[in-house]
Curated annotation (Swiss-Prot):
Listed PROSITE patterns: EF_HAND_1, EF_HAND_2
Protein family membership: Belongs to the Ca(2+):cation antiporter (CaCA) (TC 2.A.19) family.
UniProt keyword terms in alphabetical order: Antiport, Calcium, Calcium transport, Cell membrane, Glycoprotein, Ion transport, Membrane, Metal-binding, Repeat, Sodium, Sodium transport, Stress response, Transmembrane, Transmembrane helix, Transport
The encoding gene: NCL2
Entry superkingdom: Eukaryota
Protein name (Swiss-Prot/TrEMBL): Sodium/calcium exchanger NCL2
Single GO molecular function: calcium:proton antiporter activity
Location relative to the cell: Cell membrane
Native source organism of the sequence: Oryza sativa subsp. japonica
Positions contributing to Ca(2+) 2 binding: D350, S352, N354, E361
Glycosylation sites: N179, N298
SUPFAM superfamilies tied to this protein: EF-hand (SSF47473)
Amino acid sequence: MAPPPPPTRCLPVLLLLLLVVAPLLAHGRRPFISDGGNANANANASVLRLPSAAAAAGEDMGCEMSYGFLPCTTTAWGNLFLVLAYGFLMFKSATYLSSGSEMLLQILGPGIVGGLFLPILGALPDALLILVSGLSGTKEVAQSQVLIGMGLLAGSTVMLLTLLWGSCVVVGKCDLSENSTAIDSRDTKGFSLLGSGVSTDKQTSYAARIMAISILPFIIVQIPKIFKLHSGHQITVLIGLIVAALLLLSYCLYQVFQPWIQRRRLEYTRLKHVMSGLLRHAQKHSIGRLLDDEGRPNVSVIEKLFHRIDQDNDGKLERGELQAFIVGINFEDIDWNSNLAADQVMADFDTSRNHFIEKGEFVNGMLRWLDEAKRTVTSGAYSKKFLNDFHARTRDEQTGLLDKDEEEGEADGNPTWTCIKAILLLLLGTAMAAASADPLVDAVHNFSNATHIPSFFISFIVMPLATNSSEAVSAIIFASRKKKRTLSLTFSEVYGGVTMNNTLCLAVFLALVYVRGLTWDFSSEVLIILLVCIIMGLFTSFRTDFPLWTCFVAFLLYPLSLIMVYILDYKFGWS
């Protein structure tokens, strides 16, 4: 077995990631020049415009072309198309950053890289969008566009703690026992508000407490507004910036020296790889195919596989029989012993907790795994290659250790090659995020002007979908496994994402406000962030069991947040 590459092979290249962003942002935008004479230009700007000789000569076209060549328009439909196009690019960049981060974490393990670099890279798309929202143009233009950054910051936090949190409760609900604890994989009470729900572990509540503490910088910058002070706004912005940066550093160092958060992510991806390996082996050695051409599970083949594993023919699988089957798989591409793998499968399949896997439990467990494999790998043909692709994807997220399987290829199991692939994904994701952030902000701003919808509401609703939808889909898929452990890992990721929003993204926003001398006038926006974080933070910090009715509390907070901003800004004149 080849040892994993030392961190020094990957660390220098990771340092370059921070240097890649600066040149892209420094040369990405042209100064915004407006003389107020856009009436004629606007009348002629009904289509997407490409650069022309007139543009090269500096003629005003009514809209600003990012990088001097990307199309622009002043119409609502044209800008909607641009928002969707650039939003998709931002979505792909977030996907690449997430995949590269997971792969690198598996190779290097918990430590400096996993604690310092990877959390920052995960929040990079949001941070870049916030940065470019007020980076260029006059002070007045920056003051107008920076509201897009605040909308993204508030929308991302609120979406994670309301829509995503509530969705995970709905799809992950199980029957609650007499002591209100969820029973893994048992969901017979339907949508009973009190009889079904989810449970998490204590460490998940610790992550929620860290998230609640991270709102401190928001409170600091609001002090002049709270006490109606006429001076000291810039000082409090600077203090808030310093506190946010210190909290970010503390959070990262905490993960380095107490790496339980990283280990939870590591455990999460390893479980996915064991699942994919068992499915692939079952496909190869079962009598028939596990899926037909339409992707429907073949229950008879799954039952034949059960009888093959059941060596004593007593109609149930003992742990020893399961371990013997796993030993036959010969996991050469994963640093895992058969005892641990058998424990993982027993915990996932044995829903009755009688230390046996009955035929019904085995069939249901295989059906869940196959369903998750279908949702993870988008393949047109459900052949053997389908499960091979699923296994390859989870292996890339796993250890990168040497793989001797002939079908997978020699290079895929090489840890050095996996490290290079992870870094390339990170570089590609960073470059895409840096390149598409500026055009996306411009498109949102122009769409707001064309439709007369405040840019805050557009960025609050639309932009978090571009930067967080990949993680949201993954979280919902794994919450649907209806296990306390996977739900705990899922909620920990949600709370970690909010913590990075409240530290890194807020620090970027405050730095932008302070350096450019912008006015801090975001009381209503900060208020909804504080309310949602405090309500959900207190709610999740001191309890581990959540009945189904709690999801409606989370869901209601989302529209209430939008309504509150509208009333405070447009009825009471807060902004």
